[in-house]
């Protein structure tokens, strides 16, 4: 995980000159940077945050009632701490046949601030990956073994370990990373096109539905195929929904060679209704 965190920091800074000599500088910002205002109890805020997230997913499809979580939080065994300790994931089956896997807890209020006054909605984001339904298992148990879940889990842990990803995303719009621990879940016949020599896969973070760039209202941003950019009605601070897009090695090389310009170019190349979808079977955009 240490190598992954270092690689992520290097990746998000590429193409920006000396402005981002250390991505960790963002972590020195005060917790109440968004100037929240609330005197609700932590329990109230956790419940309101959970309901707001559920409302978004229910708008996009059929939300599985069973939450994907751990019997024992990875935090207790030395993993990154999520805002309220709880680490969970949700599964949504969409009318178009796709499936969404999403983190559920990165935007919980911090549990070490008992009152809402001065608290924020965690790291200010939740990640999701959308994939064709025929490329992922049917049962929750098998879903947790899928490459889609492993990629989502790795990126979520990465963000929790860093702590300041939201501020960087607000400034840079698109980030990219190379994720470990995903390659073994990918069918062997697809690894040559997706897994690099270090055993990692590339991912682009932050693609939005085409209508998001021009829509002023979060609750109008989702349509039959799109996912909203933000979660409405969070109790403390704004929370973004961040797409994870699996990259081919050729696409990852474009980013490695050209940095921020490469990420922007890929965003332009990923068009149409499959823009946000990750699949082992799609042709490379480059």
Short names for language-model regions:
Residues 2-10:
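Short hydrophobic helices that act as membrane-entry/anchoring signals
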Residues 4, 17-20, 276:
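Positively charged, low-complexity intrinsically disordered regions
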Residues 10, 14-84:
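The feature captures two recurrent sequence modes
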Residues 12-15, 159, 273:
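Short, flexible helical or helix-coil boundary motifs
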Residues 30-46, 126-142, 251:
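Charged, low-complexity surface segments at secondary-structure and domain boundaries
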Residues 40, 44-47, 51, 146, ...:
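Alpha-helix boundary/N-cap detector
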Residues 62, 78-131, 167-284:
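Aromatic/basic-lined ligand-recognition segments
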Residues 132-166:
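Compact, glycine/acidic-enriched structural inserts
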């Amino acid at each position: 995980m240490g190598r992954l965190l270092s690689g992520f920091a290097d990746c998000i800074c590429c193409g920006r000159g000396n402005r981002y000599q250390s991505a960790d500088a963002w972590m020195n910002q005060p917790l109440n940077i968004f100037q929240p205002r609330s005197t609700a109890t932590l329990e109230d805020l956790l419940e309101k945050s959970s309901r707001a997230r559920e409302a978004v997913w229910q708008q996009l499809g059929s939300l599985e009632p069973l939450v994907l979580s751990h019997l024992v939080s990875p935090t207790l065994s030395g993993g990154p701490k999520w805002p309220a300790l709880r680490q969970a994931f949700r599964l949504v089956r969409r009318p178009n046949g796709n499936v969404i896997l999403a983190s559920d807890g990165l935007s919980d209020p911090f549990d070490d601030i008992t009152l809402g006054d001065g608290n924020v909605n965690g790291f200010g984001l939740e990640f999701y990956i959308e994939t064709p339904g025929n490329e992922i298992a049917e049962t929750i148990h098998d879903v947790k073994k899928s490459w889609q879940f492993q990629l989502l889990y790795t990126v979520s842990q990465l963000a929790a370990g860093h702590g300041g990803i939201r501020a960087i995303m607000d400034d840079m719009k698109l980030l990219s990373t190379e994720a470990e621990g995903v390659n073994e879940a990918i069918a062997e016949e697809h690894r040559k096109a997706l897994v690099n020599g270090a055993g990692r896969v590339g991912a682009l973070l932050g693609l939005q539905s085409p209508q998001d760039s021009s829509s002023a209202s979060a609750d109008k941003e989702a349509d039959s195929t799109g996912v909203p950019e933000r979660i409405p009605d969070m109790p403390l601070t704004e929370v973004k929904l961040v797409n994870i897009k699996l990259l081919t090695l050729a696409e990852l090389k474009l980013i490695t060679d050209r940095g921020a310009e490469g990420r922007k170019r890929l965003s332009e190349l990923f068009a149409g209704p499959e823009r946000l979808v990750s699949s082992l079977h799609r042709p490379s955009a480059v």
